[in-house]
Amino acid sequence: CYIQNCPLG
């Protein structure tokens, strides 16, 4: 993911 709170990237 683009957000830092995304565990899967």
Curated annotation (Swiss-Prot):
Cysteine pairings via disulfide bonds: C1-C6
Modified residues (Glycine amide): G9
Main location group: secreted
Keyword Disulfide bond: yes
Sorted UniProt keywords: Amidation, Disulfide bond, Hormone, Secreted
Compartment(s) of residence: Secreted
Any one cellular-component term (Gene Ontology): extracellular region
GO molecular function: neurohypophyseal hormone activity
Pfam families documented for this protein: Hormone_4
Function, in words: Oxytocin causes contraction of the smooth muscle of the uterus and of the mammary gland.
Family: Belongs to the vasopressin/oxytocin family.
Complex formation: Interacts with oxytocin receptor (Ki=1.5 nM). Interacts with vasopressin V1aR/AVPR1A (Ki=37 nM), V1bR/AVPR1B (Ki=222 nM), and V2R/AVPR2 receptors (Ki=823 nM).
Listed name of the protein: Oxytocin
Encoding gene (name): OXT
